[in-house]
Curated annotation (Swiss-Prot):
Region listing for Interaction with PCNA, in residue ranges: 336-344
Gene: Fen1
Protein name: Flap endonuclease 1
Highest taxon of source: Eukaryota
Binding site residues for DNA: R47, R70, E158, G231, D233
Keyword Lipid biosynthesis: no
Length: 385
């Protein structure tokens, strides 16, 4: 699910935090990619020929096709990807997973009804909703990446959190995912649409963490509370509080505890046994592998291994696979070209920029308190600058 309404909120109130670029703009960059998100995209993709990609036994192979050619495209553009795979979900996510299971059951019923009615559009729609990434899909993708010479990381828990840890440690430039909670985990850069197909002609959308904090006039802790109010995977949100009201409340009261002390209980109902504090701690201290101990290496591809793995039962075209392997080799040889900024040492993310945002937020808080004192503490939040 990510964070509900966050991207639009940033676009509306902190547009300076978003930049659109072509893929080639990221030449020479190392990027941590949410592997499960990619595999899902590949599995639901419909080939222009309309045929289902599958082995001789009928097992889908579209995830491998997507991973193979999309990774080659990234490398062709000078980007060095590292794929990060999900581990076990945190206990707090059980509620969200239960909701997904319910939606899946509803989709199965709707698919049956569409099939009985001969509704082709409905069949396609509900088939897509039933797609999920399995352990077998992930296992095959890892084997493929190894043969391609591309590194991957097994996260102990959430992939987005591990990606953010790699960014903060200076191991990679950005996190590439469609889930905005990578920012909540503290990734200083987030790239959306990086792994979309070239045919969709979507520019890569880059979000800057420091600029969004500055634009929203909040610090990192307040941003986490904002994301919880908007709606995240780890706890319920307060019904009736949308993005606009959420940022007003955070700008006025600065944390959820103070918001709850001042919230109109006749207007808003707080969820029973609301686990917002545990969710907050999960964002602040997620379960991740130590990024400093992770060694990322891009090595030469195994052409014969790729042919053996992808052709035969998986029915990939051998000539295309060999051509792909040659492109991988060519990109490996071209990696001697570097970005100008790579001549300077890349340091892990520091709190300096967020401290500046915090100072600005504290000033805003002081101003808000003065305003409340003058007006005897009105309940409405000020509109953020």
């Amino acid at each position: 699910m990510g964070i509900l309404g966050l991207s639009k909120l940033i676009a509306d109130l902190a547009p300076q935090a978003i930049r659109e670029s072509e893929m080639k703009h990221f030449f020479g960059r190392k990027v941590a990619i949410d592997a499960s998100m990619c595999l899902y995209q590949f599995l639901i993709a419909v080939r222009s020929e309309g045929a289902q990609l599958a082995t001789v036994n009928g097992d889908p192979t579209s995830h491998l096709m997507g991973m193979f050619y999309r990774t080659i495209r990234l490398l062709d553009n000078g980007i060095k990807p590292v794929y990060v795979f999900d581990g076990k979900p945190p206990d707090l996510k059980s509620g969200e997973l239960a909701k997904r299971a319910e939606r899946r059951e509803e989709a199965e019923k709707a698919l049956k009804a569409a099939t009985d009615a001969g509704d082709d559009a409905g069949i396609e729609k509900f088939n897509r909703r039933l797609v999920r990434v399995t352990k077998e899909h992930a296992k095959e993708a890892k084997e493929l990446l190894t043969l391609m010479g591309v590194p991957y990381v097994d996260a102990p828990c959430e992939a987005e959190a591990q990606c953010a840890a790699l960014v903060k440690a200076g191991k990679v430039y950005a996190t590439a995912t469609e889930d905005m909670d990578a920012l909540t985990f503290g990734s200083t850069k987030l790239l959306r649409y990086l792994t979309y197909s070239e045919a969709r002609k979507m520019p890569v959308k880059e979000f800057s963490y420091d600029k969004l904090l500055e634009g929203l006039a909040i610090n990192n802790r307040e941003f986490i509370d904002l994301c919880i109010l908007l709606g995240c995977d780890y706890c319920e949100s307060i019904k009736g509080i949308g993005p606009k009201r959420a940022i007003e409340l955070i700008n006025t009261y600065r944390d959820i505890e103070t918001i709850l002390d001042n919230l109109d209980s006749s207007k808003y109902t707080v969820p029973e046994n609301w686990n917002y504090k545990v969710a907050r701690e999960l964002f602040i201290e997620p379960e991740v592998a130590n990024a400093d101990s992770i060694d990322l290496k891009w090595v030469e591809p195994d052409e014969e291994g790729l042919v053996k793995f992808l052709c035969g039962d998986r029915q990939f075209n051998e000539e295309r696979v060999r051509n792909g392997a040659k492109k991988l080799m060519k990109s490996k040889q071209a990696q001697t070209q570097v970005r100008l900024d790579s001549f300077f040492k890349t340091l892990p993310s520091t709190p300096n920029a967020t401290n500046a945002a915090k100072r600005k937020a504290d000033e805003a808080k002081k101003s808000a308190n003065n305003k409340k004192a003058k007006t005897s503490g009105g309940g409405r939040g000020r509109r953020p600058k």
